[in-house]
Each structure stands twice: as structure tokens, then as C-alpha cells.
Swiss-Prot record:
This is 1-deoxy-D-xylulose-5-phosphate synthase. Its EC number is 2.2.1.7. GO terms for biological process: 1-deoxy-D-xylulose 5-phosphate biosynthetic process; isopentenyl diphosphate biosynthetic process, methylerythritol 4-phosphate pathway; terpenoid biosynthetic process; thiamine biosynthetic process. InterPro entries: Dxylulose-5-P_synthase, THDP-binding, Transketo_C/PFOR_II, Transketolase-like_Pyr-bd, Transketolase_BS, Transketolase_C, Transketolase_CS. Pathway: Metabolic intermediate biosynthesis; 1-deoxy-D-xylulose 5-phosphate biosynthesis; 1-deoxy-D-xylulose 5-phosphate from D-glyceraldehyde 3-phosphate and pyruvate: step 1/1. Mg(2+) binds at residues 146, 175. It comes from Syntrophomonas wolfei subsp. wolfei (strain DSM 2245B / Goettingen). The gene is dxs.
Length: 638
């Protein structure tokens, strides 16, 4: 079944294959992709769309000497298969297995770590300039999608690359047909001419190129003489790239191996910055993904025969947010929703269909999204910016300068906060408390369950100034959402359990963990107070200060980085209040956390209930009886 694929252990093995063998290899790779993602979850549709492109790149170029940088990196599975990681695909995105994104620590063939969008051209240009300064001659290739090309950073890099005139190849993987549909015989003929080294084509030479097109060429050339600028813009679909200093080539059929190899071979010999525009189809070769590429962009485990995903019984926080937005929009005609190319991921698909005039998908432009919201808020609207925690980092200055400084009522719905699991360190939302907490005028909340999320969203519309609500990926706690909404006052915490031995102050996902810790402590004869803080800023200073003064032992639990997070805020507050109390902070460590199931990651980080119990016993052994201490000691040694 995989008779060719099993012989491919490095890109060198591709160079001896015939075209029919490579076509068969493409089919075998697609079968492995479907099998692997069905088991492990991941990005399927985009990888099915770049099989031929990946094969052609690794056949023409000599990786790892030649550098190939995959923008975002979610489409690099084929690259991994071709570079010695075929046997590890069964561990894709699993703890201890291979990453779902390029990772320099994983392989010498991964030239640059990616995970966020639109960084590839900047990184590739940096490598090209470093190569030039060091007198080297290797090729540098950036592979970027049409969606990623919407980001300002990509255009900044294109602009700079055109000025530098260094040898750099940018492959535009257009899998949405959003830039050009001009694929056909005439385009193929032009591509052959454009990439033939005997034609050093310039804008001034376009007439000679037109003359070589069979049949219609001379007439077009005569028209070009009369309408030079018009013809230039009509005949060169990538004129924007030409004006930026790139030689534009394309569109090329991204599934035609022979064409791709021929064009790339010629491009490799050309000088200066080159942009190759390829047209690919997401989901190619697997019908469910081909028919619904958006569903199979990022997908959980599924049944290969039907494409049906394994369903979860509870609603996700994302779905609950989406439901709230639909209901709120019916009551408040000033509500508008903004997202940065994450309509489905942030739960706004139904909103976009029901309220298209009040929905704005700005593309991969988080900075613009935030300042767009600021402009709307300054003019009387109530914008909600729905964004992943890890991507909101990209708009930090806009949050500070354009929103918070002016106290504008923008609501940030921050999805995928804390650990997100299998997507790993580039996607964990580990830092939002830390990078938001010190911004003046900003209120920050984190729900412990589904009902609390709805209460916080409801309350945000009554608060003055900007509000950030961060919530985790995945399903909720199974709490019933009440029909009556509670209007929360800024800083208002919730007492969950009275106690007498120590105080536990938790927030967000930390509350669920804290509940389990309380149960474990009760089994050891320890009775703690448990408070759901709800707010990271402002803190409920009265409740927290009172607990510290009464118990003198304070345990904080959060799923944010320890540095600058919720626990740090409490420590700072106690110093300000002059309260002497012993603190134990449970939070994410000062390191980038690997990929894997969230529950397993918490266990590895000693943030699961059993590990926290051990930490409490180590910090305050006097809370436990002699027998309990001995049991905990033995447990910790096992």
C-alpha cells in the first residue's frame, strides 16, 4: 500500500523518483495524512492541499542547506513526512510526540519555528540577508497562504524585501481562490516564458513576451503599444508584487507536479526577490475535507469512513459565547462583533449569518481589529473583539494606546486562554493576565464555569471602559446556565466554601482544580476556605485581605504564567496593605509548555490536584496529622 512512501526517509530519496512514482507517492501521503489526523486531530484540509507543492519543493531544493520556512506551519505535515518523521506521525500533537508545527528542536529540516501567521517572509528575508553577508549561496523559500498574506506584517516584509533585492523566493499558496482565478493555457504559457532564464523579463519587455503567445500575441502586443499601462495591469495579475520589487510568476496549478517542478527549477536560477503564485485546493483527495474545508481546517479525531467527528456531550465555552452574542444582538442594536479570520473558531458563525451588517472579519489583522473597535466605540457602538489569547498579544500597543488610554468601552472576548493542549507553545494562552493586568482602566475577568461566563458577558455591557473576559478552550463544567442573569460589580468575588485552616483563592479554570483540592484536603482532615475571585483586576481587596489576616496561609491557583499573573497581583496587594501572610502560588512556570492533552500537561507541571496536595503538605506540614503526613510522603515518592 505504501510501497513508495516507505522508501522515503529524507528529501534526497525524492530526487530519483519518476513522475508516475511521485504521483503515486502523493496518493500514499494523503492516505497517511487522513489516517494520522483521524487518530490525533490536527490540521487536515490545508495539508491535503499542499502535497504536490511540498513534494516539488523538496525535489527541487536541497533542504536542509536550502531553507524552507512554512508560514503558520499548520500545513507542514507533508514536510515532516518527507524529512524522516513518517513513522512518528502516529504521535502527531501527542505529549512526547512530534509537534503540529515546524520546530527547530525537532529536526534540522525545520528552518524556523512557526505557529502564528504572517512571519515567514520576514524570517526568510533575515536568513537571505544573513546568507549574503556571510558569502553563502543557499536558497531561501517562504511558503505563505493567501489568508496570511492579509496581515500587515507580511506586506511590511514584502516591501522591505523588494528594497533589498536579495535572492528570495516567496511561494504564495492560494487555497481559497481569493486573489486570482486566472488558471489556464495562456497562464501556463506565460509562466514557462517568465521562468525561462533566456528571458530576463522586465516591465519594458512585456511586448516581446506577448508576441510569443500563439494566435493572439501580436494583437495584444499592438494593443500594448497604445495602452501600455492598461495592458500591464491586465496581463500581470501580480502587478502589486511587481511594484513592490518582486518578479511575479503565476498563477500555477499547485497540484501539477510536472509544472511545479519545472517552474521551481527555473526560479531557483533567477536573481532577486521572486513571488510564485500557486493555486491549490484545501482537502484535495479526501471528500469530506474537500467539501467542508473549514470544518477540517483544525479538527479533532474523526471517523475516516464518514468524516464524522467524535462529539462532546457538553457545550464549549466558545459555543456559549456565540449563543450569548446572538441573544444580546437581538436586544442591543449597538452591539457589533469583530474577529481576525477566526469566525468559526471564536463561535461567531451564526452571528455572522444572522447579523452580517454588524459582523466584521478583518482578516489576520489583530492590530487593525482592536483599533477598528476603538473607533466604533468612540462613535457610540459596543464592539466585542473575539480573539484567541495567543493572538491578542499581537495587538498589545493598540489595547494600550487606542482603547485603554481613552477608556473606550471595548469588550475583549479572549478564547483559548491558559493551556490549549495539542497545538502547543505557540498557541497556549499563558500570558494574558500578565500582559493585560498592568494596563490602567482595564477590567479583567475569568469565569469558573459556563454560567459565570454568561454573567460576565452580561455585566461587561454595563461597565464603563474596556473589559477583558478570558476563558479556556473546550467544554465547560456542566453547570446549568440560569435564566436570570447576575450583574457583577467590578472586583466582586464569590465564596464557594467556608473553612478554617487556610484560604484558597482561585480564578478561571483554577476554580475547578481548587474544588478537587478541597475534596482531597477534606479527606486529610484539612478544611480550607475557597473563594472564586472572578476578577483579576480589580481584585476583591476586602475579601482577600480578610482571608489573609484570618488564616495567614494563602494558596492561589490560576492557569496563567506565574510571572505577573493573578498570584503575583495578590502578593503585591498584600504588600501594599502591610499584611503578613504565607503564600503558595500554583501557576504556569517560567517556561514554554509543550504540546499534549491539557490534563496530562497539568500533571507534568505539578498543577493537578494530587500534586497541589503534595505542595500544600510540603509548605504547611503542620496542617496534617502525623499519619496524613506519612501517607503524603509515601505518595510523593511513588
Amino acid at each position: 500500500m505504501d510501497e513508495i512512501l516507505n522508501t522515503i526517509n529524507s528529501p534526497r530519496d525524492l530526487k530519483k523518483l519518476s513522475l508516475p512514482e511521485m504521483t503515486q507517492l502523493a496518493n500514499e501521503i494523503r492516505q497517511l495524512l487522513v489516517k494520522s489526523v483521524a487518530k490525533c486531530g490536527g490540521h487536515l484540509a490545508s495539508n491535503l492541499g499542499v502535497v504536490e507543492l511540498s513534494l516539488a519543493l523538496h525535489t527541487v531544493f536541497d533542504s536542509p542547506e536550502d531553507k524552507i520556512i512554512w508560514d503558520v506551519g499548520h500545513q507542514a505535515y507533508v514536510h515532516k513526512i518527507l524529512t524522516g518523521r513518517r513513522e512518528q506521525m502516529s504521535t502527531l500533537r501527542q505529549y512526547g510526540g512530534i509537534s503540529g508545527f515546524p520546530k527547530v528542536e525537532e529536526s534540522e529540516y525545520d528552518a524556523f519555528n512557526t505557529g502564528h501567521s504572517s512571519t515567514s517572509i520576514s524570517a526568510a528575508l533575515g536568513m537571505a540577508l544573513a546568507r549574503d553577508l556571510q558569502g553563502q549561496s543557499n536558497s531561501v523559500v517562504a511558503v505563505i497562504g493567501d489568508g496570511a498574506l492579509t496581515a500587515g506584517m507580511a506586506f511590511e516584509a514584502l516591501n522591505h524585501a523588494g528594497q533589498e533585492d536579495s535572492d528570495l523566493i516567496v511561494v504564495l499558496n492560494d487555497n481559497e481562490m481569493s486573489i486570482s482565478k486566472n488558471v489556464g493555457a495562456m497562464s501556463a504559457y506565460l509562466n514557462r516564458l517568465r521562468t525561462d532564464p533566456s528571458y530576463s523579463r522586465t516591465k519594458e519587455e512585456i511586448e516581446s513576451v506577448l508576441n510569443r503567445i500563439p494566435g493572439i500575441g501580436p494583437n495584444l502586443a499592438r494593443a500594448a503599444g497604445k495602452f501600455k499601462d492598461t495592458v500591464k495591469y491586465l496581463m500581470v495579475p501580480g502587478i502589486i508584487f511587481e511594484e513592490l520589487g518582486f518578479t511575479y510568476i503565476g498563477p500555477v496549478n499547485g497540484h501539477d507536479l510536472a509544472e511545479l517542478k519545472a517552474v521551481l527549477s527555473n526560479i531557483k536560477k533567477m536573481k532577486g526577490p521572486i513571488l510564485l503564485h500557486t493555486i491549490t485546493q484545501k482537502g484535495k483527495g479526501y471528500e469530506p475535507a474537500f467539501q467542508k474545508p473549514d470544518i477540517f481546517h483544525g479538527v479533532g479525531p474523526f471517523d475516516v469512513d464518514t468524516g464524522t467527528q467524535l462529539k462532546k456531550s457538553l457545550k464549549t465555552y466558545t459555543e456559549i459565547f456565540g449563543d450569548f452574542m446572538l441573544n444580546q444582538a437581538q436586544r442591543d442594536n449597538k452591539l457589533v462583533a469583530i474577529t481576525a479570520a477566526m469566525t468559526s473558531g471564536t463561535g461567531l458563525s451564526e452571528f455572522s449569518r444572522n447579523f452580517p451588517e454588524r459582523f466584521f472579519d478583518v482578516g489576520i489583522c489583530e492590530q487593525h481589529a482592536v483599533t477598528l473597535a476603538a473607533g466604533m466605540a468612540s462613535s457610540g457602538l459596543r464592539p466585542v473583539v473575539a480573539v484567541y489569547s495567543t493572538f491578542l498579544q499581537r495587538a498589545y500597543d493598540q489595547i494600550v494606546h487606542d482603547v485603554a488610554l481613552q477608556k473606550l468601552p471595548v469588550i475583549f472576548a479572549i478564547d483559548r486562554a491558559g493551556l490549549v493542549g495539542e497545538d502547543g507553545p505557540t498557541h497556549h494562552g499563558a500570558f494574558d493576565f500578565s500582559y493585560l493586568r498592568h494596563i490602567p482602566n482595564l477590567i479583567i475577568m475569568a469565569p469558573a464555569d459556563e454560567n459565570e461566563l454568561v454573567d460576565m458577558l452580561h455585566s461587561a455591557f454595563s461597565m464603563e471602559g474596556p473589559v477583558a473576559i478570558r476563558y479556556p478552550r473546550g467544554v465547560g463544567e456542566g453547570v446549568r446556565i440560569k435564566s436570570e442573569r447576575q450583574l457583577l460589580e467590578p472586583g466582586q468575588s464569590r465564596l464557594i466554601a467556608e473553612g478554617q485552616d487556610l484560604a484558597i483563592i482561585a480564578v478561571g479554570r483554577g476554580v475547578s482544580i481548587a474544588r478537587d483540592v478541597v475534596d482531597l484536603l477534606a479527606g486529610k482532615g484539612v478544611n480550607p476556605l475557597l473563594v472564586d475571585a472572578r476578577f483579576v483586576k480589580p481584585l476583591d481587596r476586602r475579601v482577600i485581605a480578610g482571608a489573609a489576616q484570618k488564616y495567614h496561609r494563602l494558596l492561589t491557583i490560576e492557569d496563567n504564567s506565574l510571572a505577573g499573573g493573578f498570584g503575583s497581583a495578590i502578593g503585591e496587594m498584600l504588600v501594599e496593605e502591610g499584611i503578613d501572610a504565607e503564600l503558595l502560588h500554583i501557576a504556569l512556570p517560567d517556561e514554554f509548555v509543550e504540546h499534549g492533552r491539557v490534563e496530562l500537561l497539568f500533571e507534568q507541571l505539578n498543577m493537578n490536584p494530587d500534586s497541589i496536595l503534595e505542595s500544600i503538605a510540603g509548605k504547611w506540614p503542620e496542617l496534617f496529622s502525623a499519619g496524613s503526613r506519612w501517607e503524603l510522603l509515601k505518595f510523593g515518592q511513588n
